[in-house]
């Protein structure tokens, strides 16, 4: 325990005290207006009174270097949390995570709520993208959002009963009664899926004509998954639309409360099922912040290498399916040939293809195999020429450019308002890539550029930025090949999981530690941590709350695709149905990333 205590002290943070925004808030609202919470999130966490929430949010949004993006918003059931020293009394809480691009800093506002008075004012008056986040917060916790434009379920069926992320809500199927779909239940479910325009503030027609309401999905090839959009059409023109998500929801955050810190790693792969190890990175880094683990240089470079391989793999599928959505079939078959080479390389290193679950708390599952460098070198010799052929043969085609240039275009202001990240944000001219601005896993040691657009994000610009991102990922991989450090593939730390196997043969204490951490799970200090990464589709993050147990008290997964789909109506109104198909192809999303 002595080693753990020393490590714990080394990881104490002063971000909550040193950030200038704390002084700005105290100057405006008084020194005693807030409770500042010490965490390992790396950002200031400030508890505000419910009555001051909108005023504080408006103040932050209007600062000289403003907090212009609502990055995340969600809740927590605090009733069973035992380690709450120094925090306001709360049965539930709601948090608001804001980002300032100019400062390259974040702030998290928290509101404490009593079980007898579960309500907060809507944040949509300040940030329109709060809409979906508030709907999910109400759905999962039963917290009323006063003034919300349409407070209804978003992940679960409209007929669902209860609030799944409450601590008293069952987490296992065996805790429910057996499911029976009677004729009456089936009729009720079908009725719940019937779209009523009036519920969404839409008119069925004007004095001269009626609008047509069309279901696109949830089983449409251009919807890219189980995704439904209800279109209000005047001929071919889209007057308005309502995205309908949740068909792929699997309760990933609830699962985090029933799995050990170690056994949850495979679930992260399936949040965005094309991203593989990219999904594991923010979770493992957040857990390592809780544990106070610093990994060896070799681990950092291996993690970067696997992440960039999966980034290339995902981008190739995105680019080829976008071209297919526009009408060209051939490139998608070429792309699958190239992706197979990546899968061969990933399988040789990890033993798996799509979902390796290979990162570990404190390292990776095992060291690189013999011959990994030869396979990577062959891929790096192959891929650049293929990228040139994609660009020359398909992406510079005049028909494709005509279908995508100027379509679903938006500027920096709209991107920030809707929480857009990744290529969609950078296409507007905002240079914000987490690997550069907030480097993690040693990205600061790599030489690469961040492709940025000219001020307007349209379908064509978003795709072309991804092509250039592919080239930069190849550049990073070359540096991994040339500069792979020697050293261990796991950190020498008591909470590294699983511990090195060879130590079990030395002493009974190490054998007991190994047995407990593998079977029961490591016990993490009671703290909060946060990690964001530049994932394949935008910024992905994990916000973890530990109550000093073998399992997470609260696992919040923020995915980019959720924010990007909420933006669809704003970007596509006034366009044609054919433009919507191109727009959907240019977003780069998968529904598991949306629905979790």
Curated annotation (Swiss-Prot):
Example GO molecular function: NADH dehydrogenase (ubiquinone) activity
NADH dehydrogenase I subunit D: annotated span: 210-596
Keywords associated with the record: Cell inner membrane, Cell membrane, Membrane, Multifunctional enzyme, NAD, Quinone, Translocase, Transport, Ubiquinone
One Pfam family here: Complex1_30kDa
Membrane topology listed for this record: Peripheral membrane protein
EC number: 7.1.1.-
Keyword check for tRNA processing: no
Primary localization: membrane
Catalytic activity: a quinone + NADH + 5 H(+)(in) = a quinol + NAD(+) + 4 H(+)(out)
UniProt-listed InterPro entries: NADH_DH_suC, NADH_DH_suCD, NADH_Q_OxRdtase_suD, NADH_quin_OxRdtase_su_C/D-like, NADH_UbQ_OxRdtase_30kDa_su, NADH_UbQ_OxRdtase_49kDa_CS, NDH1_su_D/H, NiFe-Hase_large
Region NADH dehydrogenase I subunit C, residue ranges: 2-186
Domain of life: Bacteria
Keyword Zinc-finger attributed: no
Location relative to the cell: Cell inner membrane
Cellular component terms per the entry's GO annotation: NADH dehydrogenase complex; plasma membrane
Similarity comment: In the N-terminal section; belongs to the complex I 30 kDa subunit family. In the C-terminal section; belongs to the complex I 49 kDa subunit family.
NCBIfam families: NuoC_fam (TIGR01961), NuoD (TIGR01962), PRK06075.1 (NF004739), PRK11742.1 (NF008728)
Subunit relationships: NDH-1 is composed of 13 different subunits. Subunits NuoB, CD, E, F, and G constitute the peripheral sector of the complex.
HAMAP family: NDH1_NuoCD_1, NDH1_NuoD
UniProt function note: NDH-1 shuttles electrons from NADH, via FMN and iron-sulfur (Fe-S) centers, to quinones in the respiratory chain. The immediate electron acceptor for the enzyme in this species is believed to be ubiquinone. Couples the redox reaction to proton translocation (for every two electrons transferred, four hydrogen ions are translocated across the cytoplasmic membrane), and thus conserves the redox energy in a proton gradient.
Protein name listed in UniProt: NADH-quinone oxidoreductase subunit C/D
Species assigned in the record: Salmonella typhimurium (strain LT2 / SGSC1412 / ATCC 700720)
Taxonomic lineage from the root: Bacteria, Pseudomonadati, Pseudomonadota, Gammaproteobacteria, Enterobacterales
């Amino acid at each position: 325990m002595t080693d753990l205590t020393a490590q714990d002290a080394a990881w104490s943070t002063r971000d909550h005290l040193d950030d200038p925004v704390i002084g700005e808030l105290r100057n405006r609202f008084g020194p005693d207006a807030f409770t500042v919470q010490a965490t390992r999130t790396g950002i200031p966490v400030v508890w505000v009174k419910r009555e001051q929430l909108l005023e504080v949010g408006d103040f932050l949004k209007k600062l000289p270097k403003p907090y212009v993006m609502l990055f995340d918003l969600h809740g927590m059931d605090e009733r069973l949390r035992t380690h709450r020293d120094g925090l306001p009394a709360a049965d539930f809480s709601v948090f608001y995570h804001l980002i300032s691009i100019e400062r390259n800093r974040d702030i998290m506002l928290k509101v404490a709520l009593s079980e007898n008075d579960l309500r907060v004012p809507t944040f949509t008056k300040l940030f329109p993208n709060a809409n979906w986040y508030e709907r999910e917060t109400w759905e999962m916790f039963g917290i009323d959002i006063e003034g919300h434009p349409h407070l209804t379920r978003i992940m679960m069926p409209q007929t669902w009963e209860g609030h799944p992320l409450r601590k008293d809500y069952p987490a296992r199927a065996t805790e429910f009664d057996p499911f029976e779909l009677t004729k009456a239940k089936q009729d009720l479910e079908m009725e719940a899926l019937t779209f009523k325009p009036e519920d969404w503030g839409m008119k069925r027609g004007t004095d001269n004509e009626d609008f047509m309401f069309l279901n696109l999905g949830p089983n449409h090839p251009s919807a890219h998954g189980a995704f439904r959009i209800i279109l209000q059409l005047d001929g071919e023109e889209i007057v308005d639309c309502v995205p309908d998500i949740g068909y792929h929801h699997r309760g990933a955050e609830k699962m985090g409360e029933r799995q050990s810190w170690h056994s949850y790693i495979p679930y992260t792969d399936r949040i965005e099922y094309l991203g593989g190890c990219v999904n594991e990175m923010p979770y493992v880094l957040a857990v390592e912040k809780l544990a106070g683990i610093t990994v060896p240089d070799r681990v950092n470079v291996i993690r970067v290498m696997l992440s960039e391989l999966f980034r290339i793999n995902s981008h190739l599928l995105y680019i080829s399916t976008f071209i297919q959505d526009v009408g060209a079939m051939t490139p998608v078959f070429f792309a699958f040939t190239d992706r197979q080479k990546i899968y061969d390389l990933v399988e040789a290193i990890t033993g798996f293809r799509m979902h390796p679950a290979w990162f570990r708390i404190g390292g990776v599952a095992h060291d690189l195999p013999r011959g990994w460098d030869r396979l990577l070198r062959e891929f790096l010799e192959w891929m650049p020429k293929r990228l040139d052929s994609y660009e020359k043969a398909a992406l510079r085609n005049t028909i494709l450019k005509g279908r995508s240039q100027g379509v679903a275009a938006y500027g920096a202001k709209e991107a920030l308002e809707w929480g857009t990240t990744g290529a969609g944000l950078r296409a507007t001219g905002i240079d914000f890539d987490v690997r550069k601005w907030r480097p993690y896993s040693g990205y600061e040691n790599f030489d690469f550029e961040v492709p940025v657009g000219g001020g307007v994000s349209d379908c064509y610009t978003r795709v072309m930025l991804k092509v250039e991102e592919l080239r930069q990922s190849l550049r990073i991989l070359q540096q991994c090949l040339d500069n792979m450090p020697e050293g261990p593939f796991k950190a020498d730390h008591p909470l590294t999981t699983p511990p090195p196997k060879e130590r079990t043969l030395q002493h009974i204490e190490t054998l007991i530690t190994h047995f407990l951490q593998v079977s029961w799970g490591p016990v993490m200090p009671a703290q909060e941590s946060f990690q964001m990464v530049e994932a394949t589709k935008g910024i992905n993050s994990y916000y973890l709350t530990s109550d000093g147990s073998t399992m997470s008290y609260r696992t919040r997964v923020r995915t980019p695709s959720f924010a990007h789909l909420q933006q669809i109506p704003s970007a596509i109104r006034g366009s044609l149905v054919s433009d919507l198909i191109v727009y959907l192809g240019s977003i780069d999303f998968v529904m598991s990333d949306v629905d979790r």
